[in-house]
Amino acid sequence: MPRKKSAAKRAREQAKKEAAVPATDTATIKTSETSATTVKPAIEASKSYVPSEDEEEDEEEEEEEDDYGELITDEVENGINQVLDAIKNNKTDKLLDPKVKFFEDPESAAAKLANREGKHKPIYLKDYHRMNILSGDALKEDDEEYEHATVDGKQSFVSQQREEKTQLLNEIKSAFSDEENEESSGDEDDGFLKKKEPSTKKEGKNLPDPTVNEENFLEEFVNQQAWIPKKGDKVISLDLNNNEEDDEEFEDAAEKFENAYNFRYEDPNAAEIISYARSQATLRRSDDSSRRRKREEKRKIKEQIKAEKETALQKKKTKKLNKLTDILEQLTKEYGAEINADMVKKITDTLLKNDFKEEEWDNVVAELFNEEFYQQEGKPTWNEDDEIMGDFYADADGDDQTEEGEVEKEQKEEDEEEGPKRKKSKKEEKLQKKKEKRKVNELVENALEQNKLALIEEVEKEEEERKSRSRTKEEQDLKFRYREVSPESFGLTAREIFAADDTDLNEFIGLKKFAPYRSKELRAKDKRKVMKARRLREWRKKTFKNENGLAPVEAEAGEKDEDTILIPVEKASKSKHKRGHSHKHKGHQKK
């Protein structure tokens, strides 16, 4: 659809048409009634006139946009306000009266607009160049450029140095002049701290709140021409082609996105060469052969076996040491024997040759405390705190109780005086016990070191026994082994199990129910289900034609034998088959 023409444009077109038509008295046309009759046919003819497509296109091209409302003058605004007031107040008489005019004539409006456009005629680039040429400024600039120009059109080195020199001198002069001004003012801080002049901000347009009064807001918005941008206002450019920097940034961002999308399946580190350090094992060549590798493997195996033997020997030695130490402490406690190297040697020899048992304790003691032991000088002594000899001391004290009753008070007094001395004696006793224990350990270790071969033989013997108890090679190669299960007959007799066929037994209960990995709950549930009396009767009736199963049948007089098992006649034809498969179904009884 073609755009609507503005009032000024319509006025200009009307003026052109009137200039083409013979001149008439416009005043009489406006005032007289006959003029109205002559204007009506012209208006009807103009309505019936349809412009062609070319004319419409030319009009659209020639038409200029009124972005800032320059065509809306004060007179037009007043007319619009009068029309709105008349509509609001329902002044239909005023609106329908042809004599009342709210807007001025189009001719005068067009003339005013032409005068305004003439006053503010823009200066184009051509006009600017023309003005420079006429004034002669352009020729002066060309002469100056020609003086400093070179053959290739660039500025010469001499002229460049001259400009830099003059610029440097000007900067030095300006710096000295600033220092003189600072000294004359007498304020040292003026050069560094200067108060900024308050910026006079232009007050914005005060518009009423549109939510409170829309009509007042619209009226003020039109009166103040708030739609026209002022200097300093932020302008949002909707045309991206105007800003070259924005175009470059947008193109870069678009290119990055396109590359990222096109190469999204590629390896991001494909362009980098990753290097790996060479290991020392593969860096140099070695003369390894298959024989050498086998020798190394054998050597490692031997070292491993040797280390295991050393570990086992050390464990055995520690075990024997603790055992001998306990025995010696027990002998000292019970028999009051003094521990020496000969006694330790006898005990170690006895225990290493034969395994020590509590039943043979008397024999060991008899070997230790023989005639040689009693022929030694001195006699055994026991500690007063000993449990075994405590009764003996108690009896001795009982006999002399009457005699010692009088002396108790004196002993108590002596004990109170000798309290600190007893504490010292207890510490000395502890140290003495530690020394004796350390001495016993040293004696036992020396004895075990002398009998090291016996310990090694014992360790090797235990290793051989362990290997003999372990599974053989064939057993190790087996991936499956049968597992023993508890026997279960599920309410059937041995005679019924041997007499029934495989299909009948599988119908009664399948072999899957005997799986050892089944849980106890499932096995108990299957057992309750299978051993129901009704189910047993039905299965026996179907298999043996008898609800009670196979009854004991007596053998004939000439063929009585305790080992004979009689089978019913109906199943006689299948007896061979049953006997051949009887071994398979023994699992129903044994399991």
From Swiss-Prot:
GO CC annotations, alphabetized: 90S preribosome; nucleolus
Primary site of residence: nucleus
Superkingdom of this protein's organism: Eukaryota
Region (Disordered): 1-70, 142-213, 281-303, 375-442, 454-478, 548-591
Sites of Phosphoserine modification: S177, S184, S185, S486
Biased composition (Acidic residues): 52-70, 177-190, 383-418
InterPro entries in UniProt: Kri1, Kri1-like_C
GO biological process, one term: endonucleolytic cleavage in ITS1 to separate SSU-rRNA from 5.8S rRNA and LSU-rRNA from tricistronic rRNA transcript (SSU-rRNA, 5.8S rRNA, LSU-rRNA)
Biased composition (Basic residues): 574-591
Claim: Glycoprotein is one of the keywords in the record: yes
Processing after translation: N-glycosylated.
Polar residues biased stretches: 25-38
Biased composition, class Basic and acidic residues, residue ranges: 10-19, 191-206, 464-478
Subcellular location: Nucleus, Nucleolus
Keywords, alphabetical: Glycoprotein, Nucleus, Phosphoprotein, Ribosome biogenesis, rRNA processing
Misc: Present with 1780 molecules/cell in log phase SD medium.
Entry's family note: Belongs to the KRI1 family.
Assembly notes: Interacts with KRR1.
Task of the protein: Required for 40S ribosome biogenesis. Involved in nucleolar processing of pre-18S ribosomal RNA.
Protein name: Protein KRI1
Gene: KRI1
